[in-house]
Amino acid sequence: MKVMKLKSCFWLIGLLLVCNVYAQELCRADFLPKASAAFDLLTQKYSEERIVKEIRAKNVRWVTNLMSASAVFYKATHEKRYLDMSEQVFGNAIREWKKNEKLMHGKDDFFALQNLALAYEILQDNDRLPMGADEVMIRFADLHFDPDFVIDNNQGQERALGFVRMCNLFPDAPGVSHWKEYVDKMWHFWYRNKDVDETATLYASIHLNDIINIAIESDKVALLKTPEIRRWFERYRDQQAPSGYMPEYGDDYFFAYNNWILVFEKMARLTGDASFRKAAWKLFTIGYPNLDIKYFKPGWNLRQACDWAALAEVALLPTFFEKSDSPVRTSLVTTRTNRKGKTDIPDQLLLRASSEAGTPFIMSDLYASGTHQHPNLRGTINYFEVDDNPLFHGVQRHATDVRHGNTVVLMKENGSGFPFDEKGSRLFTNSWFTDCVDFSQSTETVSYTHLRA
C-alpha cells in the first residue's frame, strides 16, 4: 500500500513538472485567437473604398503591410475572409499603381517590397493573383532599388529581404542579377562582424527577424549557427527583465512586443535552446494583459492591426520539441561588435539576482552608439523594475538629452513642458522643473523624526 502511494506521489510530481514545462511555452490556442480578434477589431472599418483612398494617399507602407498581414492570418487560421481581404487590397494596389506610378512611393516605403512580395507569394499559392500583377511587381521593385543603400539596420534589412523574395519569385526578371548582387552585398556587410550596430529595442527585433528570414529564404540558415551569432541572440535574451518585459533603450518608445515574441520563437528553432521559447512565453504573458487600448480599439488602425500578424507567423513555425535550455545569466555586462569590426565593446549593464519573476532588475545602456543611438543617455538607468513593476522606463522617441535619464515623473502640476510635454517641444530649455512628493502618510524614522521613508 505504501509502495502504491509512493508511486502515485512520484507520478503526480512528474505530471506537475511536465505541466510546468509546457506552461512556459506558447501554445497556438493561447495567442492565435487573441491575435486574430485584435486584428479584426483594428480593421473593423475596412472597406474597398477606404483601401482605394489609402492607396491614392500614397500610404504604401501600411497598404502593403495589410495585404501581407491578412494573407499570413489566412495561412495561420484558414479563414477565407483573410484571403479575400488580401486579394482585394493587393488587386486594388496593382490597378492603381498601373495607372499612376507615383502612387508606388510613400513615407517609409522601404518596408513595402518585402510585404508586397509575401502577399504575392501567398496569393499565387491560392490562385488569387490579378492579371498583370507580374509586370507591376517588377516595376515596383525597380523603382525602389538603390544599390548603394548598404547599411546594417532595419531599413537596409527590410530592403534586402524584399529583393530576396523578388529574386525567388521572378528569377528571370531583367534586373535580377543586380538584385542578387545587392542582397549579397547587404549580407556580407553585417555577416563579416556577425553583429549589427543597432541600439534600440524595437529596431533590433525588426532587423533580427529580417536577417533570419533572409537566411531561411536564401538557403543560408547554416551560416547563422556560429558561436558569435549564438552570443548575439543570447545578448537580447539576457536583456529581458525578470517580469518578461523587454527594456527599451535608444530611439525607442513603441513597446517592443509581438515582434520580439516572433524573434525569440525563431531563435529557439535555430539554436535548439528552449530558453528562447520561455522568453517568448514570458513576454506574451506579462505583455498581453498590459497592452494599451490602441492595440484593441475598434476602428481603423493599420499600424497596430498589422503588428498582430507577427503572432500569426508564430503559429506557422515548425513544431519545437527540444526541452533543454541554457540558463539566463544574472548580473553581467554584455558585449558587442560595432560596424567597424571592433569586438568586446561593453553594451548593456544588467543587474539582477536571478531571472525569476519579481526579482529587482536594472539595465543601463553603456554603448549608446550605432543606429538610433542616444549618446547623451549613456550610463543612465534605462530601465528599473521591482516586483514585476517597471519604475524607470523609456521616456519618448527622440528624447535624447540627459534630462530624459534617471527620471521618474510623479505628478504633472504644470503642463508647460513638464518635463517632456507629450505634444510640446522636447527642446524646452532655460527652466528648472520641480515637483514635490507628499510623504505625510509615510513612516517616521526613529533617529530623525523630521525625515520620512
Name the predicted role of every residue range.
Residues 302-452:
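Catalytic and substrate-binding regions of extracellular carbohydrate-active enzymes
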Residues 11-20:
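Bacterial N-terminal signal peptides
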Residues 219-223, 246, 392:
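Substrate-binding/catalytic groove segments of enzymes
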Residues 24-38, 231-235, 249-353:
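Terminal, non-catalytic domain-edge segments
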Residues 2-10:
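Bacterial N-terminal signal peptides that target proteins for export
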Residues 40-42:
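N-terminal module of bacterial RNA polymerase sigma factors
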Residues 44, 48-232, 240, 252-253, ...:
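Aromatic-lined, polymer-binding surfaces characteristic
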